[in-house]
Amino acid sequence: MKQDNFDKGAWAAKKKAERQRVFAMVEQATQQLSDPAKLWEYLTIQQRFDRYTVSNALLVAAQCPTATRLADYETWAQRGVSVRRGAQSISILEPGKSYNWADGSVGRSFNIKHLFDIGQTNAPQTSPAKPDPKTLARAIVSSSPVRVRAVDSPGDFVARYDPAEKELRVARHRTPQQLCTGVLAAIVEARMDTELHDPPADPQANRDLALFMLCQRYGLPMQKPELSDRQKALDAKALRGELETVRRLTSGCMAAVEKQLAHLRQAEKGDHDER
């Protein structure tokens, strides 16, 4: 009879050490966000993978800042894609089972999941088509979570959120690019006002981080942000909490814009079909 040489204790110790290594990587990556270059790498990854938690986006940015499309080995294989020999996997955290502590609070275990970027495979890399500026501007304005009112305004005013009226005021006769950036900034403020129950440590800085990710997603120019002094003063866990709020706001904005873009594409397709 074949003897089972599997050492459960050694396996558990190996998995524990791996988790500790990944948790340490998250802490180190968080602390490095005071470096503007590291912050921009993180924000770039977070906007590409807007549904990833902050911790997992930090992990991806630390291990593969150029990542654009991630999947585990089995998923790539199911798609008929081969991972290149010698490719180094990217470790992220995957929620495991929940459990109850003695004080009644609920904890959750984590497993390590190993991913590979499309650049580590034999799959062709393609960039998604960007909408034209006019279509993007229409989608952004239509994605507002509050009512929109067009106004005549001189000067360089583009858009502003009025918290008292729960209304977005948008200037007429602006270029599509002006509308895209200006309205996105106002929408972020509207979502912060209507969706957040607890005020962030630095609302203006959070808005700038969210707007930078949105501008990156849609190919719009914007000055690169940095963490504010108040954000830098937060401990690592609290800072990730702030960034998680920013991530949720940004992801919500993206989902709303993508929904409107899909409607506009469908309407345009219908117009072409009728011709």
Predicted segments, located by residue:
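N-terminal accessory/interface modules of nucleic-acid-binding and processing proteins
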Residues: 1-275
